[in-house]
From Swiss-Prot:
It comes from Enterobacter sp. (strain 638). It comes from the Bacteria. The gene is sucC. GO terms for cellular component: cytosol; succinate-CoA ligase complex. This is Succinate--CoA ligase [ADP-forming] subunit beta. Belongs to the succinate/malate CoA ligase beta subunit family.
């Protein structure tokens, strides 16, 4: 679950981290009033959406008058912002963040993620702030410095100083950086985060560090014990199909293709998408129904997949381990009958009672194509989309 920038900065303030004075506003009038609270300009106005690249898309602007603030708010509130990180529809802009402008001398980067290979929280810092860290990692990886947090000892001040020295910081900036590092680590661990990022972390012309931007991603599996973070959730920023899938404990991610995929198991789902691509198709989604692929969940999965108007065919790929394939077949037949599927459905069953499941599909009289293998399934679903 992602948070907005203003929400991230609210958390920063609770933990004593430096950030510009700012207010999240829902109307143009509130935006003007926020500027008055902050004081004399210039100010920075920012669209609040769960996506990067806002500046290049016109969603961030430095303004010198309240008239400009009102004009910006009137232009963006209620509209959708399209960036390189969104789809063609963009994300809805429901709030504008108005902040005091900051005089920037240098931009840095500081962030943390859970590193699965080391099974630790790893902090990353770089002198290349203000740009995508993925781009820095690809083009100049030597400019990214890392420290891993020991799960028993926790974050240590010397680790913050180590990163500060590698960034070339001196004097009071080392102390300020270490405080920010320790604060971010505390937020990350206490709030069960999956991602925290300050990009950029800036050195002002007065020689101080300021968290100019903030990005937080909470671990959805830990939200049950983070009630205040749950209340910050903005479902308007989420794909409606993904939100519906989450209610049924289905792992769904919308993509841009036209072949709907329903699979049990995340690894098998990724492999299914790969082989569809290999044979010239484009997956419309990632959907893992998990081990408990009951008729009800399969039915709901079909509804979610078919709510995407781009879907021209559906590929169901089920490996029956604990779950019997004949029961899965019953679920598929029931779901197709209930939902009224009007596109070709290709089904590949493998494992426990696979032959019985395939026979049930063949005898159902429905527009269901039984595939003999995963390759055969991919070829058939691509051919169905192409009308062959």
């Amino acid at each position: 679950m992602n948070l907005h920038e203003y929400q991230a900065k609210q958390l920063f303030a609770r933990y004593g981290l430096p950030a510009p004075v700012g207010y999240a506003c829902n109307t143009p009038r509130e935006a003007e009033e926020a500027a008055s609270k902050i004081g004399s300009g210039p100010w920075v106005v920012k669209c609040q959406v769960h996506a990067g690249g806002r500046g290049k898309a016109g969603g961030v602007k430095v303004v010198k008058s309240k008239e400009e603030i009102r004009a910006f708010a009137e232009h963006w509130l209620g509209k959708r912002l399209v960036t390189y990180q969104t789809d063609a529809n963009g994300q809805p802009v429901n709030q504008i963040l108005v902040e005091a402008a900051t005089d920037i001398a240098k931009e840095l980067y500081l962030g943390a993620v859970v590193d699965r290979s080391s099974r630790r929280v790893v902090f990353m810092a770089s002198t290349e702030g203000g740009v995508e860290i993925e781009k820095v990692a690809e083009e100049t990886p030597h400019l990214i410095h890392k420290v891993a947090i020991d799960p028993l000892a926790g974050p240590m001040p010397y680790q913050g100083r180590e990163l500060a020295f590698k960034l070339g910081l001196e004097g009071k900036l080392v102390q300020q950086f270490t405080k920010i590092f320790m604060g971010l680590a505390k937020i990350f661990l206490e709030r069960d985060l999956a991602l925290i990022e300050i990009n950029p972390l800036v050195i002002t012309t007065q020689g101080d560090l300021i968290c100019l931007d903030g990005k937080l991603g909470a671990d959805g599996n830990a939200l049950f014990r983070q009630s205040d973070l749950r209340e910050m959730r903005d479902q308007s920023q989420e794909d409606p199909r993904e939100a519906q899938a989450a209610q049924w404990e289905l792992n769904y991610v919308a993509l841009d293709g036209n072949i709907g995929c329903m699979v049990n198991g995340a690894g098998l789902a990724m492999g299914t998408m790969d082989i569809v691509k290999l044979h010239g198709g484009e997956p419309a989604n990632f959907l893992d129904v998990g081990g408990g692929a009951t008729k009800e969940r399969v039915t709901e999965a079909f509804k979610i997949i078919l709510s995407d108007d781009k879907v021209k065919a559906v590929l169901v790929n089920i490996f029956g381990g604990i779950v019997r394939c004949d029961l899965i077949a019953d679920g598929i037949i029931g779901a197709v009958e209930e939902v009224g599927v009007n596109v070709p459905v290709v089904v590949r069953l493998e494992g426990n009672n696979a032959e019985l499941g395939a026979k049930k599909l063949a005898d159902s009289g429905l527009n269901i194509i039984a595939a003999k293998s995963l390759t055969d399934a991919a070829q058939q679903v691509v051919a169905a989309v192409e009308g062959k």
